[in-house]
Amino acid sequence: VGLTDIDMSAIDKVRRKLQRTLGRALEHRFLDRYRDLRRSGDYEPSAAQTAQRSLRHAILDYLANNGEPAHVDLCVQHISMADNLTDALVGLGILSRIDCDDRQAMMQAFYERWCSDPLVLLKWFFVVGASPVPGAIDGVRHVMSQPYFDLMNPAHGMNLLGGFFRRNYIEFHNPDGSGYEFLADVLLEIDQFRPDAGSWLMPQIMQWRRHEPRRRELMRAQLQRIASTDGISSGLYELVGNALAESEAA
């Protein structure tokens, strides 16, 4: 039971339009409140400061996504002037969802600032994977090719690949099917050395029957491609086989 014939592009279009509409209609109020919430004292992990930061971040998200270059600049400034990791990471996450020239520069600057911290690097991996901008797959593949990324490290895979396959609802469901093909490529690669690790990358594609016909067929084709590959593990074969069998019984 649930939604069927889901069109992720249509959902995203409506969501973005609503966000832009609110961001523009409430622009001046948002800007005033954003400035009012600027912290004057030292950073504290208190409930009061946490609530203020959360509201400030939500306002910044609406402003940065309303289409005004000045507000993208505000997001860049937010990251650059951050005196704590929370502000910097949230700002980077907001900017990562905007297709603009500053995005890649700030992503690289953040990496260079924090690359020596393994835990922060994991968070950066997630931001890269979840970024819903055109070319997201190329960005993930680029990180996978770098010496600082280790596919054998579960935490690396969980954050970078999990960010894309589990949380990037836009580019994973790109209407050209590239996200589904990428998933099949990665599953087949991982299956060679960690046969039990692929299932956590698959929650979106396991819901393939609920999507609109074009995406449904593209996802099914990649599931069939995996199932027909010689030498895959019994676990992956069973997982994919069950998904395909359920569709035939439905």
Regions of interest found by a model, annotated:
Residues V1-A250:
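Long, ordered, helix-rich scaffold segments
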